[in-house]
């Protein structure tokens, strides 16, 4: 048994990724006369030794614009028939996709490294828990004009966290009389390692959820060099005594550790929760038998001392550790503001152990608004959302099951990309995960 120690590589956010999103809104695709070929150049992480190849990696491109067409894929690209194509990089790190409709695309890839592979690639000792390498670009314009110019896809590398955010239930539900219900919300964290882990003192940060958002990623990069994340609340697992989380198991954090199962089929008995965010709010009944989460910081005043998990999102979450007094950290009223009624906390990106970017559905586009991402690529290269912008659907977002250990323990999907790692369900129960 050991107290988990963690360090995170501080990686620079790509200005190129930001600029491509801006360009996408300025290009007219209606004059495109033919299908085009797309060449993607995958560049190795900065930590790799000079000349170390990325190897054969699968790159995925997904058309996110509205342009229609019947393009086919040949060469190294393979079409899935769903607006998504996959291609494998060659010895130079290049993947070619032929017959693409000029439009806007998301491009991504990810792969794992063992500690030994990390040592071989970087020349530095690696963590036994392994590493994730990810690369992504959102809203990349593809036009005839840039057909001959490779799209640069920069990879970043980070340790695989042993403790991960595994489930978020923020949607709420409706009872038999169609009345909305919110007290049954909860968060789960999962010990992905093979050893018990002392998680006492762990901080759980809820990302700011304002509209418009307090800082866009571009603004955070401009003002804080991409080294801060903005949160509205921070809760802490009490640090006064050890809390050992067994290997391959879940810690359940709730707003009301009571039995909610009589409200609807989407609510559950949460009396077995590990920790509860105590509140004087009349809608949230406290359970004195369940330990209290410590409210370490809040943008809001009482009685909003429960976890402010927004029904339809955004509802992003980070977890981190620090020995510092977080109340002394820099706070902000928002981009360009020096005064205001709501003050938010700035968390150093370098200490974040895991993060999930949970976005709100855009009713106009039918998907999430990627421009509202709160987390950098090296924390979460993707995002997750539920089907309703207003919530009350009973939907839970949860990590896919990647496999099992020799003794039957769960291995949850963790590629640092929530678009890959998470699914949405209305039936999955607390502390349970799918088999895949």
Regions found by a protein language model. Give the residues of each.
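Solvent-exposed beta-edge/loop recognition patches
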Residues: 226-427, 435
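Glycine-centered loop-to-beta-strand initiation motif
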Residues: 40, 89-97, 241, 249
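A structural motif detector for short, solvent-exposed N-terminal "entry" segments of globular domains
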Residues: 45-48, 52, 155-213, 301-316, ...
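Short, acidic Ser/Thr/Gly-rich low-complexity loop/linker segments typical of extracellular
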Residues: 66-95
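Structured interaction patches on ligand/partner-binding surfaces of diverse proteins
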Residues: 84, 113-154
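Short, ordered, surface-exposed loop/turn motifs in non-cytosolic proteins
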Residues: 46-72, 198-201
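Bacterial Sec-dependent N-terminal signal peptides
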Residues: 1-4, 16-49, 153
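A short, solvent-exposed beta-strand micro-motif common in secreted/extracellular proteins
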Residues: 95, 99-122
């Amino acid at each position: 048994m050991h107290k988990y120690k963690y360090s995170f590589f501080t990686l620079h956010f790509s200005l190129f990724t930001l600029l491509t999103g801006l360009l996408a809104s300025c290009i007219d695709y209606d004059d495109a006369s033919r299908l085009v070929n797309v060449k993607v150049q995958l560049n190795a992480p900065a930590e790799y030794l000079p000349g170390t190849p990325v190897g054969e990696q699968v790159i995925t491109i997904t058309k996110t614009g509205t342009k229609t067409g019947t393009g086919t894929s040949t060469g190294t690209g393979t079409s899935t028939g769903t607006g998504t194509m996959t291609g494998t990089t060659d010895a130079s790190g290049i993947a070619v996709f032929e017959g693409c409709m000029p439009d806007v695309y998301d491009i991504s890839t990810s792969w794992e490294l063992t500690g030994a592979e990390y040592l071989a690639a970087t020349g530095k000792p690696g963590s036994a828990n392994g590493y994730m390498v990810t690369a992504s670009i959102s809203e990349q314009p593809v036009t005839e004009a840039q057909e001959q110019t490779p799209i640069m896809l920069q990879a970043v590398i980070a340790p695989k966290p042993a403790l991960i955010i595994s489930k978020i239930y923020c949607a709420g539900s409706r009872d038999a009389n169609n009345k909305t219900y919110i007290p049954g919300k909860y968060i789960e964290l999962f010990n992905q390692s093979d050893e018990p882990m002392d998680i006492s003192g762990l901080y759980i940060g809820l990302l700011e959820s304002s509209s418009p958002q307090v800082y866009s990623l571009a603004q955070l990069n401009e003002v804080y060099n991409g080294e801060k994340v903005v949160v509205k609340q921070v809760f802490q697992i009490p640090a006064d005594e050890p809390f050992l989380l067994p290997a391959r198991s879940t810690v359940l954090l709730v707003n009301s550790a009571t039995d909610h199962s009589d409200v609807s089929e989407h609510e559950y008995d949460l009396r077995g929760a590990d920790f509860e965010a105590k509140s004087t709010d009349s809608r949230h009944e406290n359970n004195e038998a369940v330990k209290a989460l410590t409210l370490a910081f809040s943008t809001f005043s009482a009685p909003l001392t429960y976890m402010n998990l927004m029904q339809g999102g955004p509802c992003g979450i980070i977890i981190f550790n620090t020995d510092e007094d977080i109340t002394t950290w820099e706070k902000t009223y928002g981009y360009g503001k020096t005064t205001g009624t709501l003050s938010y906390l700035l968390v150093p990106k370098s200490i974040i152990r895991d993060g999930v970017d949970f976005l709100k559905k855009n009713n106009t586009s039918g998907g999430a608004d990627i421009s509202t991402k709160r987390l950098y690529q090296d924390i979460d290269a993707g995002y997750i959302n539920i089907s309703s912008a207003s919530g009350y659907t009973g939907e839970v977002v949860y990590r896919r099951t990647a496999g099992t250990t020799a003794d039957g323990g769960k291995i949850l999907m963790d590629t640092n990309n929530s678009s890959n790692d998470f699914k949405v369900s209305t039936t999955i129960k607390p502390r349970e995960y799918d088999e895949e």
